[in-house]
Design a protein with these regions (language model features):
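Structural beta-sheet core signal
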Residues: 156, 223-225, 255
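Radical SAM [4Fe-4S] cluster-binding motif and immediate context
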Residues: 41-218, 227, 242
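Structural recognition of alpha->loop->beta junctions
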Residues: 1, 171-179, 241-255
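Flexible glycine/acidic-rich beta-alpha junction loops that bind and position SAM and/or redox cofactors
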Residues: 79, 190-195, 227-235, 250-282
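Short, intrinsically disordered, charge-balanced linker/junction segments flanking boundaries
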Residues: 1-7, 173, 246, 277-282
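C-terminal accessory region of radical SAM enzymes
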Residues: 28-36, 41-45, 213-220, 247, ...
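Short aromatic-enriched loop/helix-cap "lid" or pocket-rim segments at secondary-structure transitions
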Residues: 23-25, 32, 82-83, 138-139, ...
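Glycine-rich beta-alpha loop elements in corrinoid/cobalamin-binding modules
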Residues: 1-29, 263
Length: 282
């Protein structure tokens, strides 16, 4: 048996010693297509607090995901926002900014397999970081397959305003998309610049208007906003409120409090402005 602590692309704390193994090269789309199917109700085990590891059951799936199936199709993100964990992956390999994904047939087959094991599944959720960043031609292939073969609603929960286009939204809705979630984060150009987020306020507003055009065909879109940034001024907060006030209704807001992890670039940027970073235990 091989020592698990030698596994590439992982770090381990073993016997009070940090082991930093080499990183494997990023997989190509062809290699992603050649991966075996994801384990899903294939004799996995799950940890129950106070009980230890046990065989996973349908009840475990139901308590975690209800009647939905959660998946990720694309890997990578073209942005480099300092508040996001992707910034650390990009630090290790700049190619992580390139969007990589398996073929439309592969992701549809994955969903087929999940439904074959749990026929009661009634929705699919894509948790990609930049789903709309895929080329139109790939989305079109996916939509044709999904509409013809899967035939249950799906939601897209990782959308960057820069990549919101009417033609992409239209074909996704026709295939069964019923909800979308987009990251806005702030209505202040100053704070967006601080986060190293290149999406301009004008483009954010354009994206909300595009989504509003399709409000008859889907649930209200959800928009992410980050608060409790120690760098944010009263003027920055007011700019965010003004933007929210101007956005077309209806919509939902997901409000997040910024948690700064020590030794990250975000922490260094905040400390560079003379602001103390609380311990991660606080």
């Amino acid at each position: 048996e091989k020592d698990y602590a030698t596994a590439p692309s992982f770090w381990f704390n073993k016997n009070n010693k940090i082991i930093k193994n080499r990183n494997l090269p990023l997989m190509t789309p062809k290699e992603m297509d050649e991966l075996p199917p994801l384990m899903y109700e294939d004799d996995e085990i799950i940890y129950h607090q106070g009980e230890g590891f046990k065989d996973i059951t349908k009840d475990d799936y139901m308590s975690y995901q209800g009647l939905g199936y959660n998946t990720i199709w694309t890997i990578g993100c073209p942005l480099h926002c300092s508040f996001c964990g992707n910034s650390k992956f990009i630090e290790y390999d700049k190619n992580y900014r390139r969007l990589r994904y398996s073929s439309p047939r592969t992701i549809v087959n994955e969903i087929h397999r999940a439904i074959s094991k749990q026929p009661y599944l009634s929705s699919v959720a894509f948790w990609d970081d930049s789903f709309m960043g895929m080329p139109y031609v790939e989305l079109e292939k996916f939509c044709k397959l999904y509409k013809a073969e899967i035939k249950i609603p799906f939601a897209v929960y990782g959308v960057i305003p820069t990549y919101v286009r009417e033609d992409k939204i239209a074909i996704l809705l026709d295939a069964g998309m019923n909800r979308i979630r987009m990251g806005i984060q702030s209505g202040s150009e100053n704070i967006l610049e601080f986060y190293k987020r290149p999406t301009k306020l004008k483009r954010i507003k354009e994206a909300t208007k595009i989504l509003s055009k399709f409000k008859r065909y889907m649930m209200p879109p959800a928009y992410d906003i980050i608060l409790e940034n120690p760098v944010e001024s009263t003027e920055d907060t007011r700019a965010t409120l003004d933007m929210i006030y101007e956005m077309p209704r209806p919509f939902n807001l997901n409000i997040f409090a910024l948690k700064v992890i020590p030794n990250t670039q975000l922490a260094k940027d905040i400390e560079g402005r003379g602001i103390d970073i609380p311990s991660i235990q606080d």
